């Protein structure tokens, strides 16, 4: 069983912002596998389904980004999911737009949502899909809570689809295979 977590902030004003990439990827997976994310529990919205023979729980924490660990630990404990089977999808400023990076473990890298998840799980050993949003020329908060330009949005839509495929690959083939397949790929207009 896998817990697939998309990080983001709740509220219409955050829809389609850089910081909500995780929510967007979870929505793509939900659509592909006909999983309704319409249940409220674990301080978030979630749905249950299958990818092949694997049961998956899709979770969108409603705690705001910096407290995402509260939601993740509640769902993981309830379903008794191993940390190695918790996949977290989130935005990453250290990666260029058009790229993603799959990792099996690692530090928070300055991302407060991941930092909170690491604290609550008491471990940094869980797979993640880091989606590049590029470096800001402006205030970081304004940047991550801002929307993509039209040109960026064209690239991001393709990256979101690729990120969903990377998550599915982790479930079906394992982290190493997903890393080999998706790390280093760059999508351009």
Swiss-Prot record:
Origin: domain of life: Bacteria
TM regions (residue ranges): none
Catalysed reaction, written as an equation: an N-acyl-L-alpha-aminoacyl-tRNA + H2O = an N-acyl-L-amino acid + a tRNA + H(+)
Keywords recorded for this protein, A-Z: Cytoplasm, Hydrolase, RNA-binding, tRNA-binding
InterPro entries: Pept_tRNA_hydro, Pept_tRNA_hydro_CS, Pept_tRNA_hydro_sf
EC number in record: 3.1.1.29
One GO-annotated biological process of the protein: protein quality control for misfolded or incompletely synthesized proteins
Subcellular location: Cytoplasm
List of catalytic residues: 19
Entries under SUPFAM superfamilies matching the protein: Peptidyl-tRNA hydrolase-like (SSF53178)
Uppermost EC category: hydrolase
GO MF annotation terms: peptidyl-tRNA hydrolase activity; tRNA binding
Residues binding tRNA: 14, 64, 66, 112
Site (Stabilizes the basic form of H active site to accept a proton): 91
GO CC terms: cytoplasm
Site (Discriminates between blocked and unblocked aminoacyl-tRNA): 9
Alphabetized CDD domains for the sequence: PTH
Its job: Hydrolyzes ribosome-free peptidyl-tRNAs (with 1 or more amino acids incorporated), which drop off the ribosome during protein synthesis, or as a result of ribosome stalling.
NCBIfam families xref list: pth
Protein family: Belongs to the PTH family.
Subunit structure: Monomer.
Protein name: Peptidyl-tRNA hydrolase
Species of origin: Clostridium botulinum (strain Kyoto / Type A2)
Protein's gene: pth
């Amino acid at each position: 069983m896998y817990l697939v977590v998309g990080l983001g902030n709740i509220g219409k004003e955050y829809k389609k912002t850089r910081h909500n990439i995780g929510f967007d990827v979870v929505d793509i997976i939900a659509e592909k596998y006909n999983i309704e994310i319409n249940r409220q529990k674990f301080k978030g919205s979630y749905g249950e389904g299958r990818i092949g023979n694997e049961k998956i729980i899709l979770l969108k924490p409603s705690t705001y980004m910096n407290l995402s660990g509260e939601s993740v630990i509640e769902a993981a404990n309830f379903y008794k999911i191993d940390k190695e089977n918790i996949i977290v999808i989130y935005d990453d400023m250290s990666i260029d737009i058009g790229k993603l990076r799959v990792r099996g473990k690692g530090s928070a890298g300055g991302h407060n949502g991941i930092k909170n998840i690491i604290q609550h799980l008491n471990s940094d050993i869980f797979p993640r899909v880091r989606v590049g949003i590029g470096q800001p020329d402006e205030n970081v908060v304004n940047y991550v809570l801002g929307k993509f330009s039209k040109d960026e949005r064209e690239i991001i839509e393709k990256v979101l689809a690729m990120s969903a495929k990377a998550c599915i690959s982790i479930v079906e083939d394992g982290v190493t295979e997903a890393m080999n397949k998706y790390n280093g790929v760059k999508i351009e207009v």
